From Swiss-Prot:
HAMAP family: Asp_tRNA_synth_type1
Subcellular location as annotated: Cytoplasm
Organism: Shewanella woodyi (strain ATCC 51908 / MS32)
Functional summary from the UniProt entry: Catalyzes the attachment of L-aspartate to tRNA(Asp) in a two-step reaction: L-aspartate is first activated by ATP to form Asp-AMP and then transferred to the acceptor end of tRNA(Asp).
List of residues binding ATP: R219, D220, E221, Q228, E483, G535, L536, D537, R538
Any one GO MF annotation of this record: ATP binding
Pfam families xrefs: GAD, tRNA-synt_2, tRNA_anti-codon
Family of the protein in this entry: Belongs to the class-II aminoacyl-tRNA synthetase family. Type 1 subfamily.
InterPro entries associated with the record: Aa-tRNA-synt_II, aa-tRNA-synth_II, aa-tRNA-synth_II/BPL/LPL, Asp-tRNA-ligase_1, Asp-tRNA-ligase_1_N, Asp/Asn-tRNA-synth_IIb, AspRS_core, GAD-like_sf
Name of the molecule in the record: Aspartate--tRNA ligase
PROSITE patterns referenced in this protein's UniProt entry, alphabetically: AA_TRNA_LIGASE_II
Reaction catalysis annotation: tRNA(Asp) + L-aspartate + ATP = L-aspartyl-tRNA(Asp) + AMP + diphosphate
Keywords for this protein: Aminoacyl-tRNA synthetase, ATP-binding, Cytoplasm, Ligase, Nucleotide-binding, Protein biosynthesis
Amino acid sequence: MRSQYCGDVNKSHVGQEVTLVGWVNRSRDLGGVVFLDLRDREGIVQVVYDPDLPEVFDVASTLRSEFCVQVTGLVRARPDSQVNQDMRTGGIEILGKGLTILNSSAPLPINMDKNQHNTEEQRLKYRYLDLRRPEMADRIVFRSKVTSAVRRFLDDSGFLDIETPILTKATPEGARDYLVPSRTYKGQFFALPQSPQLFKQLLMMSGFDRYYQIVKCFRDEDLRADRQPEFTQIDIETSFMSSEQVMAKTEEMVRGLFNDLLNVDLGEFPKMTFAEAMRRFGSDKPDLRNPLELIDIADIVKEVEFAVFNGPANDPEGRVAVLSIPGGAKLSRKQLDEYAKYVTIYGAKGLAWMKVNDLDQGMEGIQSPVLKFLSEDVVKALLDRTGAQTGDLILFGADKANIVAEAMGALRLKAGEDFDLLQGEWKPLWVVDFPMFERTSDGGLHAMHHPFTAPTGISPEQLEADPTAAISDAYDMVLNGCELGGGSVRIHNSEMQSAVFRILGIEEEEANEKFGFLLEALRYGTPPHAGLAFGLDRIIMLMTGASSIRDVMAFPKTTTAACPLTNAPGFANPAQLIELGIEVIENQESKEEQA
């Protein structure tokens, strides 16, 4: 039905007859000539109909937005004065000779102009229309190019594309599972996988030493801009490769994607330990475009007569750190109060500040509500430590170390945006040497990555003797403050795996019930293996500049995990529930909603 895509017509086709199909993006009658912008997934081209062909012209005059049409015409160059530099096809146009309406369109329920706003609910309800818009179509096409490039790279590197089950068993991976009832085993449930973690490890045990899969995963968790209940991973696992080799191979893949698809050279990725990232940036996924760093000052304020500072400064689990913001002294008291309110979201009790109004005036040039608690020597030491200059602002965080890191790390990002401090377009890095475990709110231990991650260089006995000192052989790839992917060397013997389960409070009976198949498999010559999983949606979001992963998925869910297009989720047929042996118990809230 067509000779090429609309967006592919160019000056090399001048003088040729082409046949195109697509949708009417815009139609206008200017002085007896109809100008038609025809759109398909590859772009937009201008078609011109004049009255010399009255039958065709009359049909063209009836066209409205989103009519689906077939066009035949002659490609001609536009006059220099009419060239549209904003269009890929802006140097040519089609002189229309034929026109067939393949389908008309009802009045549109959403606005297709990119400059007009539609609510997200409207966009998702009429997603098939929303996806016709060039910015959305471009992202979906780009996504396909990324997955094709990933497959080519991994295929060429000897990896095998192997599918793993979707109906599987619940595993403790940090989020709630989506459960699927079994009809044949009444009262029992499958779980949709949060990742193919255990199956890809079993594939290593099966001898398939290089595996990958572009796979759907499911997590029933609270949603944010970068979260969806179903999402796509680039899942990779290898045998007989060290963490350094896995990082090198996957870095090569990502650098290739950016180079081939965006013409961007990311360069070699620097490595940073978890401890350094938390100390300098308050985050294990630091945005290195932001030049601000957390500066420790506990040693300076240990002796001050101000409990807010000296308490955490003398507490082994406390921390006192500052951010020095160039030009920040111009902030009003109201703006500083907003910053103070902002850090309370992350557990901080408040935010002290100091303005350096005039460095040459000594203490007279310093303004701060806590200045009365600080001696001139302390203030001088603070200024020396931070390198603050006239016009700068110093913000203080003092609390437990984890609260200071989280609150000041978040404030660092906010200040970087507010003061337009971000430098460079792309700043990748590897974060390595994570702790094996972290403390939970009830004082227990939780695996920082997952319970199948191997520690670095210790025995099971040493691990159990001091689990909080253990460092995992894990690594995260971070770009512009977003975690692109994370992975680790896996535990490959049953003694170490059992030790980790015991540390996590998983007793032998529970371990055998949930992971008996894994512990059994580990007894039969399991090779050393390691892997990594990338969040495909997040990679596409970053590469296309989208503000949400919902804008790079064809049919995403809302932030409440619903689909306005299909009205999913919905109520099940009572007969199906009976067959499954399920009874729905209504809570008071749902009864009130139905009333």
